[in-house]
Amino acid sequence: MKFMIKILITGGAGNVGGALARKLVENQKYFVVIADDLSTGSKDKLPSSKYTNWTFVYCDVNKYEEISQIMLVHQFDYVFHYAAVVGVSWTQENPIMVLNDIEGIKNILQLSKNSSVKRVFFSSSSEVYGEPVELPQNEDTT
């Protein structure tokens, strides 16, 4: 079967990325590549093995050499970028990892710019709230 639309989901073993992947593979016109380093994700969140139109690749998108190979091989139509450190307290405890995530989106945008990628979908995180005044944080505390 020829797959018409190739989709990359970074962070696809996380909550949001995994839910998106599970929904997309229900439609056979999509071929989904899930890239995740499993630092916060879980293989339990991947789509069912009954679907054959997806694959999992262990990858750290913050490392250009890892994600560039995947992008080159697959020539994606769309990229959903969900790979990031998640959770306000986790990001506070790991500020260097948060800064490393900037490399991830830079890599995705740079590799997508002159490729077959038609659109990149970027989901932000709790980092948009800035330094917390109190925890837990919500829209009213910023």
Residue ranges and their predicted role:
Residues 1-142:
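N-terminal Rossmann-like NAD(P)+-binding domain of SDR-like oxidoreductases, especially those catalyzing
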